[in-house]
Each structure stands twice: as structure tokens, then as C-alpha cells.
């Protein structure tokens, strides 16, 4: 390899399962449930790394070995070639995972989805309250002869 190319093979690998609060430790979660987030994806993790000013690369074609249905992973550079930290606030893999798990719930795409879901839930409630109540009783059934 010449000096112009970047070797991402030495970067830290983060699978979304590592910070997923829905998974158990046996299924691959690496941080505590209280510090993890719900169902993160590779794009959100990569955006959080950019926010932390860490270079990252998304590998969509890779799958998590324990559960091959979990597709995608992110490679993140924590240290330079000489061993110095790129972001002094993040010193280890575990600390990086905790920081990413803090940022994922505040990701703009996730916030938009949550607002859309809230609007959908409020819309049917408004329509049901304006419509009249039904006079039919709830208990029916087959009549005996």
C-alpha cells in the first residue's frame, strides 16, 4: 500500500447490535441497557461518528456473525497511525459505543420519524372523538333454542 491510501482494516468495527437495547448480552450487546439505544442502524451510527469528528466507513455488505440477518457495520478510526487519539474525549471502544448510543436517539431522521408517529396517533383519536357513539351492545353471540 502506498502512503496515499487509507487502511481501514485497523479501524474499530461497530455493529448496530453492540448498542441495541432490544438485544441481550448473549445476542451481542456490549454496553448496559440503560446506556444503549433502541434499534440503531449503520447510517445513524456513521452520522454520530461524523458529529464526534471521527472518520468512519459504512460497510453495508457485511453481516453480524451471530445473526446474519443483521446486515451492515461501521468502521471508525479512533487513533492515528502514530497512536495518538483523534478525539481526546473518546479513549476506548466502549466509550465510543456509549457516546454513539447517547447521540442516536437525537439523530434528525429518528426525531422526524417519532414526530410523524405522534401525529398519526393523534389524528385517529381526533376522528373517533368527533364521531357518534354506537348504540350496539358489545356482547352478542349465538342464541340458544
Curated annotation (Swiss-Prot):
<feature type="compositionally biased region" description="Basic and acidic residues">
    <location>
        <begin position="104"/>
        <end position="123"/>
    </location>
</feature>
<keyword id="KW-0733">Signal recognition particle</keyword>
<comment type="function">
    <text>Component of the signal recognition particle (SRP) complex, a ribonucleoprotein complex that mediates the cotranslational targeting of secretory and membrane proteins to the endoplasmic reticulum (ER). Binds directly to 7SL RNA. Mediates binding of SRP54 to the SRP complex.</text>
</comment>
<keyword id="KW-0007">Acetylation</keyword>
<keyword id="KW-0963">Cytoplasm</keyword>
<feature type="region of interest" description="Disordered">
    <location>
        <begin position="104"/>
        <end position="145"/>
    </location>
</feature>
<dbReference type="GO" id="GO:0008312">
    <property type="term" value="F:7S RNA binding"/>
</dbReference>
<dbReference type="GO" id="GO:0005786">
    <property type="term" value="C:signal recognition particle, endoplasmic reticulum targeting"/>
</dbReference>
<feature type="modified residue" description="N-acetylmethionine">
    <location>
        <position position="1"/>
    </location>
</feature>
<protein>
    <recommendedName>
        <fullName>Signal recognition particle 19 kDa protein</fullName>
    </recommendedName>
</protein>
<dbReference type="GO" id="GO:0006614">
    <property type="term" value="P:SRP-dependent cotranslational protein targeting to membrane"/>
</dbReference>
<keyword id="KW-0687">Ribonucleoprotein</keyword>
<dbReference type="Pfam" id="PF01922">
    <property type="entry name" value="SRP19"/>
</dbReference>
<keyword id="KW-0539">Nucleus</keyword>
<feature type="compositionally biased region" description="Low complexity">
    <location>
        <begin position="124"/>
        <end position="137"/>
    </location>
</feature>
<keyword id="KW-0694">RNA-binding</keyword>
<dbReference type="GO" id="GO:0005634">
    <property type="term" value="C:nucleus"/>
</dbReference>
<dbReference type="InterPro" id="IPR002778">
    <property type="entry name" value="Signal_recog_particle_SRP19"/>
</dbReference>
<dbReference type="InterPro" id="IPR036521">
    <property type="entry name" value="SRP19-like_sf"/>
</dbReference>
<comment type="subunit">
    <text>Component of a signal recognition particle complex that consists of a 7SL RNA molecule of 300 nucleotides and six protein subunits: SRP72, SRP68, SRP54, SRP19, SRP14 and SRP9.</text>
</comment>
<dbReference type="GO" id="GO:0005730">
    <property type="term" value="C:nucleolus"/>
</dbReference>
<comment type="similarity">
    <text>Belongs to the SRP19 family.</text>
</comment>
